[in-house]
Amino acid sequence: TSKFSFKAVNSYSEAVSALVYRQLNHLLDQPQPVDLTEHFSEPISIANHAFVLGIPDSMVNEFERTFVGTVSRHERIKYLREVYQFKLENPGDDVISHLIQSELSQAEVEGLIYVFFTSGRDSVAYMISTSMVALLQNPEQLKLLRENLPVSKEAVEELMRFCAMFVTLFPRTALEDLEIAGQKIEAGQSISVSPVAINRDPQIWDEPNTLKLDREVKAHLSFGHGIHGCLGQQLARLVIQESLTQLLRSINSIELVSAEQLAPMEFAHPVATYKVGSVFLKFEK
């Protein structure tokens, strides 16, 4: 959909900045230590998701309950159809409205809405939280970033490389015998690519386990690649960039108290992916 194009994403800048600012003020009002994920990263990701898809404000809380929380599939479908009906009667310039106005059947549109409701949200929250963990564990890089605000696109790319969320991507099946980098693969065998491994491959990256915000980042695989690459990756970049910029501009001193990301994390389905964990911070405004 065109709502995720470069041009469209650029038009979201003001709205994204406003929702980040609103959530930042909420974060700053919390008693410390405060969980960055609970009070900043996840709410920003959910609000941004709802905004772009076209979920009205009055239905966002129910979106969080049904598609972020754990409920039955029946409840999810019921809510999805309520959103569908609302957008059918109240169309706007958003993803869901554009899908409804397309030539797709209602069943096809509902299927795509379900995919959008369950995709991309966790990865943005994960990237915001783990980026802050990475920066706080690399104070010289944090200092470099503070001295060069707003956060540059190059810095965002390096953070995405360094903090990749997906352990594996969806498997693909070889249609014929082939050989890749000396590895023979027979027709019918499944192949699963690991962004975490590729993003830390010493044959591709110089000092891959070192965070270098001034690194000239090549094509990392944090958002996949090609026709199956993440549809919302440009929007994710904007949200991550704006969130880190506002956070670092508003807080002078930040201390990492604890981070669940440092411990082995469970895998979520249907692909192997790190789950978003708590990141407790203390800070001075």
Positions of predicted regions on the chain:
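Cytochrome P450
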Residues: 1-285
